[in-house]
Swiss-Prot record:
It is an enzyme of class 4 (lyase). This is 3-isopropylmalate dehydratase large subunit. GO terms for molecular function: 3-isopropylmalate dehydratase activity; 4 iron, 4 sulfur cluster binding; metal ion binding. Its cofactor is [4Fe-4S] cluster. Binds 1 [4Fe-4S] cluster per subunit.
Length: 481
């Protein structure tokens, strides 16, 4: 699906992001005008696509390239009681209408759809990679901010608004000004028990939730190179939490091995040609980034959030901060507000914070590697008295893979709920929600006020910390078990 242009043989020293951008410019903007960028793949779901389809109808336009669109049902679908994928299995009327509308739109406009009940259904940012639709060097968009997940493959992937979704439907292009580039250089190697989730939370705490605004982040260094694709997807997924437009990791053999043989991946001679192009994508030696940030990966320990934005995080071994710990007045005010909402007392050890619900799910951390990590910790244990643990695989495919490995039994034997695929408790948009005042340890990506339900309090954690927390009942790491 990539569309490199003739100037891809340029000798100019370029970053990964600059190469992908260059190879997709249909027309170059002049006098400060945006470039017109070709889009290789648009992903769709039931929440942000209905208005775009309606826009096509009202203007009498056709979907320019149905084959470059891929849809699934994820945001509003229930994660229990789903057996056939029938609309009757959705109790909420609005959710049922949204899913029904997506099905009708995809049928009318010829878009490939993976609905509930289909083994290939799941969260849109898991479905693309598992099908091989997500490939290095592509431009990928979706009406969802966590489209940045796909940047783990060396693609430029970013979320867009509904009007832009319609623009891509009609033209397969977007007018955009080039993004700035930022290198996140991770030195050293991650210690055992420290994951990509801990790393990305530490990065966001370091640069802030606005530190990446206007940038494409490229994650670099030996620690990144040694990560699996599942771990890399976690890194890129949360780039938006640092304010970035996208996050990217250069493709390598790990990437190629993941993509090869998947349903929508190139085959035969096309595969060889694709890999040859993909190998040209990594940032050139001597290329210049607009900004460089360094972080010592070897010094990291399990990392969690204590507040109400992903940048309010600390190592698990620390204590709840005081507003007086912050020198910036805005940070001080934000800390005061967050502590009040989270009902936390400064000086309280983070490990003493009692948790009501553990959520292992979302497009951030519910792939097979995440489930395996959590299951290995839970095996032979029971979750704490009064604890609720929900395990929601990010796709039906992954659910079946986990069941073949016996992971579902480990979770249910421990007392956890084993659910069907969907966005679930990541966002308070479906039946899976916290009650007011309840506190969760969640492997998702956002801890805003009310994100998991009105009045709910969210701590972002890794799958390992989630599992350990479920056992002990307070925020914990596997070392505490």
């Amino acid at each position: 699906m990539t569309s490199p242009v003739e100037n891809s043989t340029s000798t100019e020293k370029l970053t990964l992001a600059e190469k992908v951008w260059r190879d997709h410019v249909v027309s170059k903007g002049e006098n400060g005008e945006p470039d017109l960028l070709y889009i290789d793949l648009q992903l769709l779901h039931e929440v942000t696509s209905p208005q775009a389809f309606d826009g096509l109808r009202m203007t009498g336009r056709k979907l320019r390239h149905p084959e470059l669109h891929l849809a699934t049902e994820d945001h509003n679908v229930p994660t229990e009681g789903i057996k056939t994928g029938s609309l009757l299995e959705i109790n909420d009327k609005i959710s049922r209408l949204q899913v029904s509308t997506l099905r009708d739109n995809c049928e009318e406009f010829g878009v490939r759809l993976h609905p509930m009940g289909d083994v290939r259904q799941g969260i849109v940012h898991t479905v693309g990679p598992q099908l091989g639709a997500t490939q290095p060097g592509m431009t990928i968009v979706c009406g969802d901010s966590h489209t940045s997940t796909h940047g783990a493959f060396g693609s430029m992937a970013f979320g867009i608004g509904t009007s832009e979704v319609e623009h891509v439907m009609a033209t397969q292009t977007l007018p955009l000004k080039p993004f700035k580039t930022m290198a996140i250089e991770v030195t050293g190697e991650l210690q055992p028990g420290v994951s990509s989730k801990d790393l990305i939370l530490a990065i966001i705490a370091k640069i802030g939730t606005g530190g990446g605004q206007g940038y494409v982040l490229e994650y670099r260094g030996e620690a990144i190179r040694k990560m699996s694709m599942d771990a890399r997807m976690t890194m890129c997924n949360m780039s938006i939490e640092a304010g970035a437009r996208a996050g990217m990791i250069a493709p390598d053999q790990t990437t190629f091995d993941y993509v090869e043989g998947r349903e929508m991946a190139p085959k035969g001679a096309d595969w060889d040609e694709a890999v040859a192009y993909w190998k040209t994508l990594p940032t050139d030696e001597g290329a210049t980034f607009d900004k460089v940030v360094e972080i010592d990966g070897s010094a990291l320990t399990p990392f969690i959030t204590w507040g109400t934005n992903p940048g309010q995080g600390l190592p698990l071994g620390e204590s709840v901060p005081s507003p007086e710990d912050f020198t910036n007045d805005n940070d001080k005010a934000a800390a005061e507000k967050a502590l009040q909402y989270m009902d936390l007392v400064p000086g309280t050890p983070l490990r003493d914070i009692k948790i009501d619900t553990v959520f292992l799910g979302s497009c951030t951390n519910a792939r097979i590697e995440d489930l395996q990590i959590a299951a290995d910790i839970l095996k032979g244990h029971k979750i704490a008295d009064g604890m609720r643990m929900m395990v929601v695989p990010s796709s039906t495919w992954i659910k079946q893979e986990a069941e073949a490995l016996g992971l579902d039994k480990i979770f249910t034997d421990a007392g956890a709920e084993w659910r069907t695929a969907g966005c679930s408790m990541c966002l308070g948009m479906n039946p899976d929600q916290l009650k007011p005042g309840e506190r969760s340890a969640s492997t998702s990506n956002r801890n805003f006020e009310g994100r998991q339900g009105p009045g709910g309090r969210t701590h972002l954690v890794s799958p390992a910390v989630a599992a350990a927390t479920a056992i002990r009942g307070t925020l914990s790491s596997p070392a505490d078990i």
